[in-house]
A protein has these predicted regions:
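Feature 926 captures the class I aminoacyl-tRNA synthetase adenylation module centered on the KMSKS loop
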Residues: 1-218
Length: 218
């Protein structure tokens, strides 16, 4: 609900209308592509789970997706919504988040019928009167295998693991996140790309992150 409220707040300020834009995959940032990959993986998993009556597993994957959507994608992307001009990057952020919210609601509607209906009425019916009158009259979303990038998902998962461990190390050493650290070593056979390293450095307030498979010196 907080992510939905975030979207509505800035969409109202910018008078953003999703029907006036299309989601152009080739123009998206890595974060956008990651979210769309996770979204399509979610739809695929939920569809399979519901077909096999795995209700608990369905609730768990929906909860995990909402957590990553709110606490990772939105938090890492919110500055894009603060830009005054309606740049292509800002449009991409709006369209990616809009697509995620609407698709998530359709996938979660059997589990959360009233909240998803409320969100659907505002995000979809409010701007498209030709859309089905209720979210429960919509087709269940279909996943697009071409948008699922497991390598991207795995790399971002590694980033999330490193950030969580880094925060735990800071807490153990009683070093607040606002205090910068000169160097952080990560034990791994291969280094991540600079894009991911930049995220780690920003999240943990570290000047430099170095990947090494040899930790004998430490």
């Amino acid at each position: 609900w907080n992510t939905y409220a975030f979207f509505v707040l800035y969409a109202n300020i910018d008078e953003f209308d999703a029907t006036k834009y299309t989601l152009e995959y080739d123009k998206l940032s890595v974060m956008d592509k990651w979210l769309l990959s996770k979204l399509n993986t979610l739809v695929k998993t939920v569809d399979d789970n519901l077909a096999n009556y795995k209700i608990t597993e369905t609730a768990r994957v929906l909860d995990n997706f909402v957590d990553e959507l709110s606490n990772w994608y939105v938090r890492r992307s919110r500055a894009r919504f603060w830009v005054k001009e309606m740049t292509q990057d800002k449009i991409n952020a709006y369209m990616t988040l809009y697509t995620a919210l609407v698709t998530l609601c359709k996938a979660a509607a059997p589990m959360i019928p009233f909240m998803t209906e409320d969100i659907y009425q505002n995000l979809v019916r409010n701007i498209d009167k030709s859309a089905p009158e209720s979210i429960h009259l919509c087709d269940f979303p279909e996943y697009d295998e071409k948008l699922i990038d497991k390598e991207l998902e795995n790399d971002m998962e590694e980033v999330l693991d490193i950030v969580v461990l880094g925060r735990a190390c800071r807490n153990t050493a009683n070093i607040k996140n606002r205090q910068p650290i000169g160097m952080m070593y990560v034990k791994a056979p291969e280094a991540l790309s600079d894009f991911y390293i930049d995220i780690i450095e920003d999240e943990l307030n570290v000047k430099k992150v170095e990947f090494t498979d040899d930790v004998a010196a430490f």
